[in-house]
Amino acid sequence: MSEKQEAILPVVPLVPGNEPTGRPLVELTHVEKYFGDLHVLKDINLTVNKGEVLVVVGPSGSGKSTMCRTINRLETIESGDIRIDGKALPQEGRQLAQLRAEVGMVFQSFNLFANKTILENVTLAPIKVRHMDKKEAEHLAMDLLTRVGVDSQASKMPSQLSGGQQQRVAI
């Protein structure tokens, strides 16, 4: 077996019961992106199946964050196709807003409000953006914090958590 084959490991679901299905959820086909004359994304082809966890690794300036930002249209592409669950990525409007509300990404720089507890940080968007009842938002937040293994930290301030724990809260 070659070194490359030995390095391939099975995907372990982040959430039990969310095993990869083989059904494409995110598809990038021949995606191209420029910043002026700088060709940042060159013929990117990627398929992420439902239930898979993807880690994008590469040197600084190689286009990792730019590629991720194109998936929810925080960056536009010059050419190619991006599909979410088989549907073309919306250009703008309500459908795009709905997609952004459903797709979570954490970039190198993420922010938690330093003056709010972990629970308050996680409930802020559902309460303010979706007008969710506070109790319902707290119940949902605790479920999400449990899923990423930081539910016991809910009453702490961000500065009391490790960098990895803070990133999981941001997710």
Regions found by a protein language model. Give the residues of each.
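N-terminal acidic, proline/glycine-rich, low-complexity intrinsically disordered segments
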Residues: 1-9
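ABC family nucleotide-binding domain
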Residues: 10-171
